[in-house]
């Protein structure tokens, strides 16, 4: 176990995806993860930046859930639309579906209500969010 491997796991990335994020060959990422080579500070910083983004988005999402519950009453559950592929995850500001899922896991773990995950655009609320400017 190395810091690179631990941070990649926390970020929801495979080693292949972590290598892509850091702009290196996949075998370099594998060597950093196994400790055969030390990951440079820039690679660790990129993972930390992604994790900070995941935490920021999760915190904002939870704040929105709480605000809506206070305004309209707590629902039995909430629905969150998930990206179907990496391209869609990238349109949401995440490098891949796994990174989005790591953010969503933080929301699910801390949400005061049950969370249901559905494909983005498959129901009325997610479809409106997909169509909204800036989404």
Model-predicted regions and their roles:
Residues 55-135:
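Helix-turn-helix/homeodomain-like alpha-helical modules used for DNA recognition
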Residues 22-39:
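Recognition helix of helix-turn-helix/homeodomain-like DNA-binding domains
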Residues 15, 23, 41-57:
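DNA major-groove recognition helix of helix-turn-helix/homeodomain DNA-binding modules
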Residues 1-11:
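A short, Lys/Arg-rich alpha-helix, primarily the initiator
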Residues 38, 42, 95-98:
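Alpha-helix boundary/N-cap detector
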Residues 5, 16, 105:
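Short glycine-/small-residue-rich flexible loop motifs, especially phosphate/cofactor-binding loops
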Residues 6, 20, 31, 45:
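DNA-binding alpha-helical recognition surfaces that contact promoter or target DNA
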């Amino acid at each position: 176990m190395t810091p690179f491997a631990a941070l990649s796991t926390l970020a929801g990335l495979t080693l292949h995806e972590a290598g892509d994020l850091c702009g290196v060959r996949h075998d370099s990422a594998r060597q950093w993860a196994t400790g055969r080579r030390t990951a440079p500070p820039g690679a660790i910083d990129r993972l930390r930046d992604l994790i900070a983004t995941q935490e920021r988005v999760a915190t904002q999402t939870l704040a929105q859930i709480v605000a809506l519950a206070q305004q309209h009453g707590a629902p039995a559950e909430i629905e969150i639309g998930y990206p179907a592929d990496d391209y869609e995850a990238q349109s949401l500001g995440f490098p891949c579906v796994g990174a989005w899922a790591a953010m969503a896991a933080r929301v699910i773990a801390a949400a005061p209500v049950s969370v249901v995950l559905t494909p983005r655009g498959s129901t009325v609320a997610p479809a409106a969010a997909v169509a909204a400017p800036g989404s």
